[in-house]
């Protein structure tokens, strides 16, 4: 039971926009926080003092920045949430990252403000199945090639699997779902071979 949570966070991001966190209270979006580069304090204030389930999720892609939680303090008690016993590892592109879901039209210049993985199928399906989602999604990624403009004829095979996989995963996922191939169409362009 608490009225506020104080976070000390270090954020590392690129020129494509800030790392964005979503704060959920009892599975409802409560607040979004655009993290500033470097180490900063953030306070989440609740209007009433009651038992609640709070989740803090990075909703932007790891390739555009990440955060480190240095400290967490509260005026109440914190107890660990029992995470689901099953998990799904989702490997995908912008569709899995939720890019473009925060805008009426797809923006011409990439910016992290236009993505939210909690509005994309990997997160939503995981919630419906009550499994832990592990989402590794990189906009522009493909199997044969990353996205390329129409003026290019050669595939862009830099930073495709396995080089983009961020770490040796400590989780042992129950299932793995790979949702890649959409960006390959920018290279294959309907070529039959």
For each feature predicted by the language model, list its residue ranges.
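Conserved SGNH/GDSL esterase-like catalytic core that processes O-acyl groups on lipids
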Residues: 101, 106-193
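N-terminal secretory targeting modules
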Residues: 1-91, 95-114
